[in-house]
């Protein structure tokens, strides 16, 4: 086997085993705000996952939020971040055509051999869809699991019939 292929295969296995692989990056509009959902694996036992949201516009990188790079001052007042175990949600307030470009979500596990994973999405205001109610609910699925378990319990106790 080619040594380069062996190294690439080993690195991809290590990246997945380290548990910080970005699985998807989606964008949508909530009122006039851009919402970026960066879903990722999380098999780490501590908070060693570092992240960065950035925008590349006109061949220039602008860091919006994160622990890897220094966020630009012009975005700090417009950005909010929700950080949960399997999803990081960045909201950019008052999204305009000046904010269009390629958005990136990068995750990195710190340590002796830092590994990183990223996804990108091209965002244009006239192509954005409105965020659906169901995707807002998916951010925190624990209440849905509780609801399903409660329905089963109520059905078992004959309080409701489905």
From Swiss-Prot:
Cell compartment(s), UniProt: Cell membrane
Keywords annotated in UniProt: Cell membrane, Disulfide bond, Glycoprotein, GPI-anchor, Immunoglobulin domain, Lipoprotein, Membrane, Pyrrolidone carboxylic acid, Signal
GO molecular function, one term: GTPase activator activity
Stored Gene3D superfamilies: Immunoglobulins (2.60.40.10)
Gene Ontology cellular component list: apical plasma membrane; axolemma; cell surface; dendrite; dendrite membrane; endoplasmic reticulum; external side of plasma membrane; glutamatergic synapse
The Ig-like V-type domain, residue ranges: 20-127
Annotated signal sequence range: 1-19
Lipidation (GPI-anchor amidated cysteine): 131
Glycan-linked positions: 42, 94, 118
Disulfide bonds: 28-131, 38-105
Modified residues (Pyrrolidone carboxylic acid): 20
Propeptide: 132-162
Gene Ontology biological process: angiogenesis; cell-cell adhesion; cell-cell signaling; cytoskeleton organization; focal adhesion assembly; heterotypic cell-cell adhesion; integrin-mediated signaling pathway; negative regulation of axonogenesis
Pfam family, one: ig
Membrane topology: Lipid-anchor; GPI-anchor
Domain of life: Eukaryota
PROSITE patterns in alphabetical order: IG_LIKE (PS50835)
InterPro entries attached to this UniProt entry: Ig-like_dom (IPR007110), Ig-like_dom_sf (IPR036179), Ig-like_fold (IPR013783), Ig_V-set (IPR013106), Immunoglobulin_dom (IPR013151), THY1 (IPR033292)
Metal-binding recorded as keyword: no
Keyword Coiled coil on entry: no
Major subcellular location class: membrane
Biological function: May play a role in cell-cell or cell-ligand interactions during synaptogenesis and other events in the brain.
Name this polypeptide is given: Thy-1 membrane glycoprotein
């Amino acid at each position: 086997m080619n040594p380069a292929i062996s190294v690439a295969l080993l690195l991809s296995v290590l990246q997945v085993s380290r548990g910080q692989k970005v699985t998807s990056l989606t964008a949508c509009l909530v009122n006039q705000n851009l919402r970026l959902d960066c879903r990722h694996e999380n098999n780490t036992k501590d908070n060693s996952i570092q992240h960065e949201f950035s925008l590349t516009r006109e061949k220039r990188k602008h860091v919006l939020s994160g622990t890897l790079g220094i966020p630009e001052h012009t975005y700090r007042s417009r950005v909010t971040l929700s950080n949960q175990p399997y999803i990081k949600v960045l909201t950019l307030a008052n999204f305009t055509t000046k904010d269009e470009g390629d958005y990136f979500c990068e995750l990195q596990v710190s340590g002796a051999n830092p590994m990183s994973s990223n996804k990108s999405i091209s965002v244009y205001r006239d192509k954005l869809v409105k965020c659906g109610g169901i995707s807002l609910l998916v951010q925190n699925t624990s209440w849905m699991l509780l609801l399903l378990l409660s329905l089963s319990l109520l059905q078992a106790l004959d309080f409701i019939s489905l």
